[in-house]
Structure formats: C-alpha cells, structure tokens
C-alpha cells in the first residue's frame, strides 16, 4: 500500500532514482473512500533523487504507475503477491512510460489495468 509521503524506487531508466508520492486519486472500496494506492494505480510523484543527465529532473512532478509493492496483494485465485520494494514507472501526460527500459519484475495486475507498453518492456511479469 502506497500512501501520501511514501518514498519509492523507480523501475525504469528515466533518470530518477527516488520519488515521493504526493497525490493519490480517490477510489471507493466497499463503500468507503481509500487513501492508498496499490498495484496498477496511477499516482502523482515528485522526484527526490535523480541522475544528472537523465530525462527526469529533481523537483519535477510526474504521474507514475505502481508496479511493485512490499505489502502483499490478494489475487482472484486466492494467492498473494508481494515484492521486496515499492517501485513505480514514470509516465508522461499521455500515460506512456518516459523511460525505454523497465528494470526488475512487474506484477500481472499492470496488464489488467491497460499498461501494455510497460508489460512488453518488462523482463519478467509475475
């Protein structure tokens, strides 16, 4: 679960290394509004640490999709999936990835949310 203020790793080669979540869209879950994001959700992030020659610059605000979470997520078949870290892929205004490579595995839930470009670039889909 990603909340406002959470620091996340980037799973692409956009130039950002660490980002911080600054905005989560409201969604209704069992009649209650949730204030957290999970796999496949688009959040607003700001870059906290970046490479000097990368496309993403420190202090800039981007949209990002959550591709890995440390908190376990239940799947429809009853199994659970969790990762070692929280990671995102930075997106442009058209919700396409800024980077040209995806580093590390991504969850299968990304495909269900319609981010086919990220799934095709990922080395492994779990």
Curated annotation (Swiss-Prot):
Keywords: Ribonucleoprotein, Ribosomal protein, RNA-binding, rRNA-binding
Coiled coil: none
Annotated GO CC locations: cytosolic large ribosomal subunit
Pfam families: Ribosomal_L14 (PF00238)
GO aspect biological process, one term: translation
MF terms in GO: large ribosomal subunit rRNA binding; structural constituent of ribosome
Organism superkingdom: Bacteria
Described purpose of this protein according to its UniProt entry: Binds to 23S rRNA. Forms part of two intersubunit bridges in the 70S ribosome.
Summary of subunit composition and partner proteins: Part of the 50S ribosomal subunit. Forms a cluster with proteins L3 and L19. In the 70S ribosome, L14 and L19 interact and together make contacts with the 16S rRNA in bridges B5 and B8.
Family designation: Belongs to the universal ribosomal protein uL14 family.
Record PANTHER family: 50S/60S RIBOSOMAL PROTEIN L14/L23, LARGE RIBOSOMAL SUBUNIT PROTEIN UL14M
Descriptive protein name: Large ribosomal subunit protein uL14
Native organism: Persephonella marina (strain DSM 14350 / EX-H1)
Lineage, opening ranks: Bacteria, Pseudomonadati, Aquificota, Aquificia, Aquificales
